[in-house]
Amino acid sequence: QMCIRDRDYDYALIIGTRTFGKGIAQSVLGLDDGSVMRVTTHRYYSPNYVTPDRSGVLPDLVVDADLADEVARLLCGEAAAESPDVLVLELAGQEWYVHKEAALSADYAPAFAELLSALAPGTPMTLDGESVDPETVSADWETEYVSRWMEDVEDSPYAEEINALAALGAVQGDENGSFLPEEPLTRAELVSLITQAMGYWCWTNQGRAPFTDVSEESWYATAVDITYHLGLVQGNENGEFDPDARIDHQQFITILARMGRRADLKVGWRLDSVTDEELAAPDVQKFASWAREAAVAADSLGLLADDLADIDPNAPTTREEAAAMVYRLMSYSGILTPAAGA
């Protein structure tokens, strides 16, 4: 609870790994024999009306837990004048100073490499007064790091959003480090993407999702189970999940709205306040009736990858569009701290 409070109020720069999502409150009842019973009675919401239930809290900088202390110490270097030996970063609304001598020392070099890997695109950072990026710093200071950014999204209009998620470990590419941004998203890829991005989980005693075409050995089986039990996905009339089917825009936007309602009270309030006048708009009427409320709410909250007028409801959702919309939901709800360039 302290972590999500600090995030919402910008009290601190949060460094480490994602917390386990268990945003619940319990009532403790005293029994006659002196023992107590704990009963889960409420879902916990942050000051920004967001629950960490089932998704946890995503730090500003996602780094190996064993290196988090060292990363924090590096960032707390003494303020200094512009210099080629001092890296100045702006994170969480504050300036942080990393000194070259400390960063390249045997004790801190692994942490410095981890810090460079964790930085999102567009993070304000300077060396000797000149704007730089992690790759430039790595070259200038003659040190190595492993970039988490995707190698094939440079020309994507959503490159900043994709790489911001990648820096957080919220999306991954294939074995070659490629994201394949323009490829249509399948239902199997959908559940995998949103489960990883949001950090979703479910209780093992909830069992398997009831779909007849998802084997327990499938690479996406766990993600299907999780998203089904969270009420985010459904099957067809034959009890099938149809994992290889493509997700069209109106299907994805509907699922995005379900994600938003589950995570953020503000999204739920907007969905519940959609008016008949809004539903009657020509750009909304082209959507199927079951997708219109989601389309109105997502558009008004700035969650869509494009203008509503330019979206074909029946066209396939691409991987880059999906990542951009998930990023915008997470940014709107404060689940992640928006990257400067995204």
Where on the chain are the PLM-derived regions?
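C-terminal "post-core" interaction segments
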Residues: 1, 5-147
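Short low-complexity, flexible loop/linker segments enriched in glycine and/or proline
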Residues: 28-32, 250, 323
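Short, ordered coil/turn segments that flank beta-strands lining enzyme active or ligand-binding pockets
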Residues: 32, 47-48, 167, 175, ...
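Feature responds to low-complexity, polar/acidic, surface-exposed segments characteristic
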Residues: 119-157, 172-188, 195-222, 234-250, ...
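A short amphipathic alpha-helical interaction element
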Residues: 161-166, 190-194, 227, 256, ...
